[in-house]
Swiss-Prot record:
Keyword check for DNA-binding: no
Gene Ontology BP term (one): translation
Protein name: Large ribosomal subunit protein eL40
Family listed: Belongs to the eukaryotic ribosomal protein eL40 family.
Lineage: superkingdom: Archaea
Cellular component, GO annotation: ribonucleoprotein complex; ribosome
Gene Ontology molecular function, alphabetical: structural constituent of ribosome
Keywords: Ribonucleoprotein, Ribosomal protein
Organism: Thermococcus onnurineus (strain NA1)
């Protein structure tokens, strides 16, 4: 996590396309690359990976 709110907003206020993985702006309604409407917010905590 970021140490101060401005940095956290800059890092995490993005959408990720669930089809192609592109990063999109916070106000986006569809993906800028593929046009898919399934966008999710960027994850604030890491997903389970190598250590789990």
């Amino acid at each position: 996590m970021a140490r101060f709110p401005e940095a956290e907003a800059r890092i995490f206020r993005k959408y990720i396309c669930m089809r192609c993985g592109a990063t999109n702006p916070w106000k986006a309604k569809k993906c800028r690359k593929c046009g898919y409407k399934g966008l999710r917010p960027k994850a604030r905590e890491p997903r389970g990976g190598m250590g789990r």
